[in-house]
Amino acid sequence: MDPYKHRPSSGSNSTFWTTNSGAPVWNNNSALTVGERGPILLEDYHLIEKLAQFDRERIPERVVHARGASAKGFFEVTHDISHLTCADFLRAPGVQTPVIVRFSTVVHERGSPETLRDPRGFAVKFYTREGNFDLVGNNMPVFFIRDGMKFPDMVHAFKPSPKTNMQENWRIVDFFSHHPESLHMFSFLFDDVGIPLNYRHMEGFGVNTYTLINKDGKPHLVKFHWKPTCGVKCLLDDEAVTVGGTCHSHATKDLTDSIAAGNYPEWKLYIQTIDPDHEDRFDFDPLDVTKTWPEDIIPLQPVGRMVLNKNIDNFFAENEQLAFCPAIIVPGIHYSDDKLLQTRIFSYADTQRHRLGPNYLMLPVNAPKCAYHNNHHDGSMNFMHRDEEVNYFPSRFDAARHAEKVPIPPRVLTGCREKCVIDKENNFQQAGERYRSFDPARQDRFLQRWVDALSDPRITHELRGIWISYWSQCDASLGQKLASRLNLKPNM
């Protein structure tokens, strides 16, 4: 065995117990003491090592998306979009790429029930020949805020109160009363889709706007959509109470059991694209993450399919240590000027460095499957074997060179440095259109959830009035019904 290239693996376990350094352990049942009943000796290194390792088994949980489940599989291109992108893994129909996917709830802690009303994370890591691509999205196509400056405040509002450690509706209602752009997202969250039946029966969305670039350098703005082949199914409120009371890990269990039984979940990938030269033609800003792109004027285009056919081998190694970041892209896919995406580019990598350390991309689940090379050396928990003498660039003693230049969006940007909101806010139209698309029973369930949320005794008359005004601007009848059930007069 080459000691410099050996990597610890359960596949090379010895037949007897050892310490972490490989020394044999002849007794893993009793501590070393002075006599049968005497005190424990500090020299019992195996005991100290065992306790110290146990004390450090847990790492900081994710500040959001803490509760999650992962599975592995492949993505296969089914339709040619090479005219839109030069991304290698999308180069032709039939091309397959290994993936790992993590589904999650967003707000609540690691051990919370999977039946709570909450957005669901839908993150996909593609292990391509040109490096990894992380498509980090949710099961809802829009978001609560359009500017990442408000993200920490938003999460604080959703998280338990720093005083009571309980999630409290009045805090959420208060914060979002200052952000009417959130109404479109709430038209999803307070709808039936706010509690998916399980992970197999929910959609996924890239949420943010990205950019596709073809080999000629032509860019197109793009939105990504995952559609489950088994359909979208949800839990109503009373069903969620029953299911959650029976098994608080029902979605994880369903995913694991389905794959183990050979009933592999599958999603179709679709995209919507907009020529950047045409982005001013709409009554909304295509870079506004609180808006969807209407499918009747920007149709879905099929791209491929994703099949999850293998359960993870170890929850900690392939779920807790699994790390996503929207900044991780490949040639042919680029960012856009979406304000929330621009913020996520920094924040995700930063939180992974906090959670897992500066070398988190060396962990097997996060490392690319292709060859890679740079001078990002050393740091805490660096376990890459290196024997180079040159750790700088350029050098006449190292043949490493720059890669071929890849196309990036050829935009010329001008403007003053300023902090401002976008021109086309249009906060109410799409939320109202979505509400009117519900059948009467679904509308009533949506209405009742808002009545319950606004009935919190800490919510003031002023706050209720603001929300009635907001929903009235989305749909007059919805505002009237909400006011009636709350015994208030609608105020436009």
Curated annotation (Swiss-Prot):
A motif (Peroxisome targeting signal) lies at residues 484-492. Optimum temperature is 25 degrees Celsius. GO terms for biological process: circadian rhythm; hydrogen peroxide catabolic process; regulation of cellular response to heat; response to abscisic acid; response to absence of light; response to cadmium ion; response to heat; response to hydrogen peroxide. SMART domains: Catalase (SM01060). The keyword Heme applies. CDD domains: catalase_clade_1 (cd08154). Induction: Abundance in roots follows a diurnal oscillating expression pattern peaking during the night period. Induced by water stress and abscisic acid (ABA) in a concentration-dependent manner. Activated by salicylic acid (SA). Repressed by ABA biosynthesis inhibitors nordihydroguaiaretic acid and tungstate under water stress. Induced by high salinity (NaCl) and hydrogen peroxide (H(2)O(2)) treatments. Triggered by zinc oxide nanoparticles (ZnO NPs); this induction is reversed by sodium nitroprusside (SNP, a NO donor). Repressed by cadmium (Cd). Inhibited by heat stress (HS) (e.g. The modification Phosphotyrosine is found at Y210. It catalyses: 2 H2O2 = O2 + 2 H2O. Keywords: Cell membrane, Glyoxysome, Heme, Hydrogen peroxide, Iron, Membrane, Metal-binding, Oxidoreductase, Peroxidase, Peroxisome, Phosphoprotein, Stress response, Thioether bond. GO terms for molecular function: catalase activity; heme binding; metal ion binding. This is Catalase isozyme B. It comes from Oryza sativa subsp. japonica. The gene is CATB.
